[in-house]
Amino acid sequence: KIAWVLTNLLSNAIRYSPENGHVVIGAHQTDDNYIEMYVQDFGKGIDPRYHKSIFDHYFRVPGTKVQGSGLGLSISRDFVEAHNGTLTVQSELGRGSKFIMRLKA
């Protein structure tokens, strides 16, 4: 299920990136013995007022032109939480988004 989450995050990052844009993926172990995996894009970003809502079932950011069901991030969060982890977002309009999955090592 964790592989599905990473695939979903990567797919989203590619779809929300500008043409010929790039996506960064990475992972590292933290000092407090967690593994953090992240997927970062450099697309239009997500308005901070939607940072919590994007993880709700069927939620789509208003004005989004990219096709989708509004389920991918909510299912991803559910899978990560089932492994006692967290899935968060860091994003600014015009600067892209970084989704961070944090799991106990």
Predicted features, each with a name:
Residues 13-14:
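Short helix-loop "hinge" at the ATP-lid/N-box region of the Bergerat-fold HATPase_c
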Residues 59-68:
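Glycine-rich ATP-lid/hinge loop adjacent to the conserved G-boxes
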Residues 72, 76:
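Short alpha-helical Gxxx[C/S/T] motif in the catalytic ATP-binding
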Residues 45-53:
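Short helix N-cap motif at coil->helix boundaries in the Bergerat
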Residues 41:
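Acidic ATP/Mg2+-coordinating residue in the GHKL
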Residues 20-33:
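Short beta-strand/loop element within the Bergerat-fold HATPase_c
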